[in-house]
Amino acid sequence: MAIQRTDRLNSLLKEVISEVIRRDVRNPYVTELVTVTRVQISRDLRYAKVFISIIGSEQAKVETIEALNSAAGFIAVNASQKVVMRYFPELNFKLDDSVDKHMRIEELLGKITKERESRQGDNSDQLEQEP
């Protein structure tokens, strides 16, 4: 039962925090290419890790995470107006690199597929040449 509650809260916080970042945060380091990928709230509901996916350079990613962490109080105040909780959790923004890892895996799988196709093409050419 508690797990379902935290899952629902995580999902709700993800949507609300995403909306607050998109609408209310006015920081040049926080671009529109910022996506809240997931939220993990602690069991006591006092702390929440907010995982962010950012498209851009490594420096831009670091600057964006720093800007979001410095604006965490502002984001929490605005988000708390949309979510009824006894205590709104303290937000800690983290870079979610799972999207980058996924893209890297896709790239490697593409290379493997091309390599297999070229090997199969070479093998079929050799079979056709032998009488």
Curated annotation (Swiss-Prot):
Phylogenetic lineage: Bacteria, Pseudomonadati, Chlamydiota, Chlamydiia, Parachlamydiales
InterPro entries: KH_dom-like_a/b, RbfA, RbfA_dom_sf, Ribosome-bd_factorA_CS
One GO CC term, this protein: cytosol
Keyword vocabulary terms for this entry: Cytoplasm, Ribosome biogenesis
Name of the featured protein: Ribosome-binding factor A
Main location: cytoplasm
Entry's Gene Ontology molecular function annotations: ribosomal small subunit binding
Keyword Cytoplasm: yes
Family matches, as Pfam families: RBFA
Subcellular location: Cytoplasm
Biological processes, Gene Ontology terms: maturation of SSU-rRNA
UniProt xrefs under PANTHER family: RIBOSOME-BINDING FACTOR A, CHLOROPLASTIC-RELATED (PTHR33515:SF1)
Keyword Cytoplasm included in the entry's annotation: yes
Gene3D superfamilies assigned to the protein according to its UniProt record, in alphabetical order: 3.30.300.20
Subunit-level organization: Monomer. Binds 30S ribosomal subunits, but not 50S ribosomal subunits or 70S ribosomes.
Family affiliation: Belongs to the RbfA family.
